Amino acid sequence: LKNDTAQLIQSALSHHRAGREDQAEQLYRQVLEERPSDPYVLHSLGVIALGKGQVEQAAQLVRAAIGANPEVPQFHNTLGVILDHLGQPDEAIAALRQAISLKPDYAEACVNVAITLQTAGRFDEAIKVCLEALDMQPTYARAYHTMGFCLHALGRLGEAVGSYQKALALDPSLVEVYNQLGVVLSQQDRFDQAAAYLRQAVQRAPHYAEAHNNLGIALRALGHVDQAIECYKTAIALQPQFPEAHYNLAGAQASQGLRDQAIESCHRAIELRPDYAQAYNQLGIVLAARGDRTGAMECYLKAIGADGQRAEFYNNLAIVYKEQAQYPLAVQNYLKAVVLEPAFPEAHYNLANALKELGDCDRAIACYDQAIALRGNYADAHWNRALALLLKGDLKQGWREYQWRYKVNLDTVLYPHLFNRPRWQGEQISGRRLLVYCEQGLGDAIQFIRFVPQIRPLSGAEVILETWPPLIRLFQGISGVDRLVEASTQRHPEDDFDLCVSIMDLPYVLGASLDTIPRTVPYLTPDPAQVQAWRQRLAGTGLKVGIVWAGRPTHGNDLNRSCRWEQFAVLAKIQGVRLYGLQKGPVADQVPSPPPEAPFTNLGEGFADLMDAASCMAAMDLVISVDTAMAHLAGALGRPVWTLLPFAPDWRWMLHRDDSPWYPTMRLFRQPKPRDWGSVFASIAQQLAVLTSQSEK
């Protein structure tokens, strides 16, 4: 070589090693003017072209280098890498094997074969080749790195962790390995360790957007949601076109109640990737939480359209259908979810709930059993299994399973006091003090108070009955009660009793069955003086009908169980009927000024407690109520009562019957299909007209 050409080559190499590729390329091309077939210069230009993404040009240059000197292993290795980039794996492997044939201990080329196999999804073969590379060079970190990636792809997470850790032990500068190791550890739920490795990644490479995103995932799993949000935002600032980071940010924002921001992040993720199924699913979750069921349904359907193999999407869609009382469609989609993912306990549980709503208790119980088999301590499944057993009339098994409610996070079953006393299981405890406390709703207390008189003869205990203020006067006449006390979240009565039992556990403790339910009525008694006063106030002709159209608005099933006053108003037009409202609370304001032809008076606003309501009911000829405490009260008083039930009734009303084993004077009117109050009121109007004509005779 001439001196000036040699200097050009040295200068080009210096620029190339320093990463100044444009200057290096310019100098290499000057050399080519003097030596157009120099294989090393052609190869170097090929490497630069590959780095710039000019893959076809890179292939031409390296092939020219090989043509000039086919005995250089490095040239074949580089060609193999280029061909892999071109999507020609077989040709790439052939080139790389040629490099190894020229240099049998060429570990770098061997790992490149593994990477080509990895890119083609041939992970098992790639692992074998990595092991070949390690035979050639036992301390080759890149071989452990590649093998770790393949093990991870095969789901062999423990082995992947070991391989990645060996790579880092050999070469702590492999930033990508810190990131990938963090991902695997997160998938193993080892989030503390994952976060530690991912922090190393972002410390070593602050502009590594993917590592910031993955650190956010680990931090969110550890409950550090605010820090996770900052990580996602950093990833997005570094790489705005990063749909996964926008998606993860949406999930974190949603968990913090930042729904508007979460929706915006979902939309951004979808803009960047229009077929991003998980982003549509996340958007659906946020919209559903905001009450936009229609929007949520559209999103879930788009998620399924983009990826129809995700059980979670069908499960979420089914939840919306169930909330809309479209139970057959809910069942259909829950079934798709469990077919796609048989080990999905929540989907089996949700399917069971939908089947229960359809009245298919046997299939529902089988699905609860499947959910419990997958997750043995699944308290919600056990508790709802109890409701299905009770709904079908299997009280013995139902009461036993009903004990699981204590393990369910339900405010309705949480007693305000923290007990340091044992629960009574039906044993003899003569001379000891037994606290019987109420739980759930007023109607539950009224229904189950019938069992209290059986306690003292069985236990020999001093019976202390604790209940809520609206029931105190009503329960004063209950036999077998030594002390009646008012429940209070401020009072801690641990020193006042020796054992305790929930009023809802009495059927279980006492072994009650469908045949042994105490059904003598009345078992509650109104105030005689108040009854007389109401009778005088309501004296006159016509059938006096007390009505209740809505329960507590915060009740979980209020949308289905309550109706509107206007639906009752048609009954006021029946000749000889006089309607009286027994309604308290905000729903009482639904009543407009009634027209003269449909006289109506709401009496409920004057009730101070349920004794007032009971005394008023005693002056009524009939009570018509949706499923509320007032229906139970009328039944407990032995008053004629018609109870209006949603298509999917509460367990206590059972199925396929128009009477109640709990209340002999009660008649049940059931919706023939979900939310069909029209049919119910048509039937009631017909029956009420018959009753009116009979009373006139």
Where in this protein do the model-derived segments appear?
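Alpha-helical solenoid repeat scaffolds of the TPR/TPR-like class and their adjacent stem/linker regions
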Residues: 1-622, 627-697
